Amino acid sequence: MLPPINFKGWIDENRHLLKPPVGNKCVYTEAGDFIVMVVGGPNSRKDYHYNESEELFYQVEGDIVVKIIEDGVPRDIPVREGEMFLLPARVPHSPQRGPGSIGLVIEKVRDDKDTDGLMWFCDNCGNKLYDEYFHLENIVTQLPPVMKRFNESTEARTCDSCGSVMTPPTASK
């Protein structure tokens, strides 16, 4: 059994590791049922994450906006410091974190049958540009290579509906 931790102390000790583009670090690497991570801002993401299970967001410092696609329609959900938000399963989402923001995110460890995905939508017309699905085993290491593949591919970033080309996100500092 793991002992309790001083969460605020943990954040202070690990703040330097919360870097773009995703900026997350797992609190408990030994956990079997949950992925418990802290995510820092700013971030520079244009992707939407697809998860077959719910995700719990608790905003510790600063505010964020969780962009979602609900029934094919984009929507913004503000989550302010001190607020908690339970995102339903299978809702594409893109947390937008401002400078200095810190949030706790709790997700279920994926079963063998679970599939995660990253997807991008055209900034101009909302058409889906690209998606890639995978079995998630390590959230810290698996997302950046998918983002890199998309960002480095002009073909993937070009909308086949309106011809607009998505500009890769600018790295946040």
Across the structure, where does each feature detected by a protein language model lie?
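His/acidic/aromatic-lined binding-pocket segments of jelly-roll/cupin-type domains
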Residues: 36, 47-49, 54-59, 76-77, ...
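Short, conserved beta-strand element in jelly-roll/cupin
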Residues: 39-40, 50-69, 103-106
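A short hydrophobic beta-strand segment most commonly corresponding to one strand
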Residues: 99-117
